[in-house]
A protein has these predicted regions:
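Glycan-recognition and catalytic cores of secretory/periplasmic carbohydrate-active enzymes
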Residues: 1-205
């Protein structure tokens, strides 16, 4: 299955007419590199680098923000930045080229612009009653303003970025992001991946 998926992604990325609509296809980069190492297939690594160069050209200037990582937002979002961040960092780890590290830092900075670094006073309700702390959680996009635990998914990469750049602040924040998500692990009840920390709600038309 992995070979078929990577063959598809590599063929798609090699097409001169390939011009993805959003940053979402950057999620192909890291798996392509993993497959390149697993199968010894340089074609996968070349496809990953081509895709990453494409997204760097589109987004490093921020003339076009990272976007398209979520299913339900029509503008820029954290997940789009994470797609590029994980891809750029994977290429740095694959090549040790400092330019990929610089690009990873840029995408990580955008991811972190969505990170809450304080405890928001929550509206009355169950989460406030349980003393939920929002430090280390992330907002989704300017359109979807709730918080989610999505940051835990890139906390390991953020920690590694801190290691590569000798930035203890990044490592410390990554630990906070990773540990914070455990607050909603409970044997009773359930809670979706998002919480509403404001009195604002989107009602639709």
């Amino acid at each position: 299955f992995l070979r078929r998926a990577c063959d598809f992604a590599a063929r798609r990325g090699a097409d001169p007419a390939w011009h993805p609509r959003s940053t979402a296809e950057a999620f192909f980069i890291a798996p392509l590199l993993a497959a390149a190492e697993l199968f010894g297939c340089e074609r996968y690594a070349a496809a990953a680098a081509r895709a990453a160069d494409h997204y760097a050209a589109r987004h490093l200037s921020m003339d076009e923000p990272y976007w398209g990582g979520t299913l339900d937002a029509s503008g820029e979002d954290k997940e789009g930045a994470w797609a590029a961040f994980q891809g750029f960092l994977a290429l740095y780890e694959h090549t040790r080229d400092a330019e990929w590290l610089r690009r990873a830092q840029h995408a990580a900075d955008v991811c972190l612009s969505y990170t809450v670094v304080w405890d928001i006073p929550l509206p009355a309700g169950r989460l406030a009653d349980r003393g939920l702390r929002t430090r280390g959680w992330t907002s989704v996009s300017p359109q979807n303003q709730h918080l989610d635990v999505y940051g835990v998914l890139y906390a390991p990469e953020l920690y590694r970025l801190g290691t590569y750049t000798n930035d203890e602040n990044l490592q410390s924040l990554a630990r906070v992001m990773y540990r914070s998500c455990g607050q909603l692990i409970d044997p009773w009840g359930r809670q979706g991946e998002q919480i509403q920390q404001t009195n604002f709600a989107q009602r639709g038309d």
